[in-house]
A protein has these predicted regions:
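Structural motif
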Residues: 43, 75, 105-107
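Flexible, glycine-rich active-site loops centered on histidine and acidic residues
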Residues: 2-18, 81-123
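Active-site nucleophile and cofactor-binding loops and adjacent substrate-binding regions
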Residues: 74-82
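Amphipathic repeat-derived elements
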Residues: 64-65, 72-74, 98-103
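Catalytic metal-binding/acid-base residues of hydrolase active sites
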Residues: 46, 77, 109-111
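N-terminal beta1-alpha1-beta2 module of alpha/beta enzyme domains
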Residues: 1-72
Length: 123
């Protein structure tokens, strides 16, 4: 059996700054690795405090430098919001800097307001 942790980076109240929320996400990942968890997964959401994680690939790249063993995953990258060639280039880069620890999760997205604000039609 394997264990993972899902990092939403949720700002539960405005008493928390963005820096505190992101700092907590970083700390949770480091502690998860120390506790023997196999994977840390990072969300992608935009334009709200439900999740302050607009780029799970950036989070994986950052955490690759702060961890040694734990696998790092995207949960999920919202594919319609990306330009395909750039997305593939970034995935390749992140997999390289993480020494092959990237677990890539992709999805179609579901929050209509995120698509509207990016000027993308939701399928």
């Amino acid at each position: 059996m394997e264990f993972g942790v899902f990092i939403l980076a949720q700002q539960r109240g405005y008493h928390q700054t963005s820096q505190q929320v992101i700092g907590n996400s970083i700390e949770q990942t480091v502690v998860a690795e120390q506790a023997g968890f196999n994977t840390a997964w990072y969300a992608e959401h935009h334009f709200n405090n439900y999740s302050l994680s607009p780029s799970p690939l950036m989070m994986v790249a950052h955490m690759a430098a702060k961890t040694q063993r734990i696998r790092l995953g995207t949960a999920v990258c919202i594919l319609p919001l990306y330009q395909p060639a750039r997305f593939l280039a970034e995935v390749g880069f992140v997999d390289t800097v993480s020494n092959g620890r990237l677990d890539l999760g992709v999805g179609s997205g579901y929050q209509e307001f995120e698509f509207e604000r990016f000027g993308v039609k939701i399928a």
